[in-house]
């Protein structure tokens, strides 16, 4: 999927100036494939790391207990990160990108939870929409400041 996206971006030349990527392995490998195929420079951005789910790490994301816990935005998931802290982290990144962008175009390579936060930064969402928002692997969404 990453190689297919890299080929597509290399052919279409959409004017991406820099790739910002999560330090987690899958996102970093995806960013590397895209960078190698397109020549777009890449930079690791720790604020794109997926949410720390505490005791729910490595458990199914569609499990009943996790889905219930996910609706409590202020809870720490027993040792994890609250949804509010995650939002603050990603919103701060987006504010920084906006301030430094000077009309640059960035490709963010991250995770489904991060995409949900990015979507909520640009568009109002209900709790239900927020909880059920998701993207496919290597899907591209465009946002404009």
Describe each model-derived feature in a short phrase.
Residues 35-91, 144:
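Phosphate-handling substructures
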Residues 3-10, 87, 91-99:
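Generic structural signal for well-ordered alpha-helical scaffold segments
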Residues 21-22, 88, 109-110:
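Short beta-strand scaffold positions
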Residues 1-40, 81:
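Active-site-proximal alpha-helix that buttresses catalytic centers in soluble enzyme cores
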Residues 28, 91-145:
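Active-site-adjacent alpha-helix immediately C-terminal to a catalytic or transition-state-stabilizing loop
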Residues 25, 48-49, 113:
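Catalytic metal-binding/acid-base residues of hydrolase active sites
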């Amino acid at each position: 999927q990453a190689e297919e996206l890299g080929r597509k971006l290399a052919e279409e030349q959409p004017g991406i100036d820099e790739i910002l990527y999560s330090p987690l392995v899958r996102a970093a490998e995806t960013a590397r494939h895209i960078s190698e195929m397109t020549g777009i420079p890449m930079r690791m951005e720790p604020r794109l790391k997926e949410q720390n789910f505490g005791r729910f790490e490595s458990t199914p994301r569609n499990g009943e207990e996790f889905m219930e816990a996910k609706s409590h935005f202020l809870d720490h998931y027993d040792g994890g990160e609250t949804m509010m802290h995650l939002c603050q982290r990603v919103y701060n990144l987006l504010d920084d990108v906006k301030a430094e962008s000077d009309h640059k175009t960035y490709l963010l390579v991250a995770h489904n939870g991060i995409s949900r936060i990015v979507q909520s930064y640009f568009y109002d969402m209900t709790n239900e929409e927020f909880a059920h928002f998701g993207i496919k692997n290597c899907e591209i969404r465009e946002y404009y400041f």
